A protein has these predicted regions:
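Beta/alpha (TIM)-barrel catalytic core signal, keyed to glycine-rich beta->alpha loops juxtaposed to Asp/Glu
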Residues: 1-147
Length: 147
């Protein structure tokens, strides 16, 4: 085995894995979107050259119904989905939006617009859209003693 990826690993989990592994993970797939942004985890992954892959970048569709996100998307003349995807990309993560139609998949690729720093900082501070798809607390490596 030469390459591994992990899913839903928190900082403690990754620290212990990195301390004990021979093969470092190249990707950590986590829930990451406006309203649920674990910046310490994203920063830890960046510092350790672990790519963050964001599943559900539009909050399982909840973000599409949020008036504040809709209004901010209008400012950039994009859909709320595009704004959400762009937000994740500007954090340095890869976005994996779910889409059931070819039209939406094509639309989701067109996210080449700049989001200003002030808007991005406001979005980082939002703490809603949680509790609907959380993976919960399930220690993988974090609570175990290091070898």
């Amino acid at each position: 085995m030469r390459i591994i990826g992990v899913s839903n690993f928190l900082v403690d989990d990754l620290e212990n894995l990195l301390f004990n592994c021979r093969i470092k993970p190249i990707v950590n797939q986590i829930i990451l979107h406006i309203g649920n942004t674990n910046l310490p985890l994203v920063d830890f992954c960046k510092k350790n050259n672990i790519l963050v892959e964001a599943y559900s970048p539009i909050a399982h569709g909840e973000a599409l119904k949020d008036d504040r996100i809709v209004k901010r998307a209008e400012k950039y003349k994009v859909t709320p989905a595009k704004l959400c995807i762009r937000y994740v990309l500007q954090l340095g993560a890869v976005a994996l939006p779910k889409s059931s139609t070819l039209e939406h998949r094509k639309e989701n690729r067109d996210v080449d617009f700049p989001m200003d720093d002030a808007d991005r900082e406001k979005l980082k501070k939002r703490k809603d859209f949680s509790g609907y798809g959380e993976f919960g607390y399930f220690p993988v490596f974090g609570d175990k003693n290091r070898a």
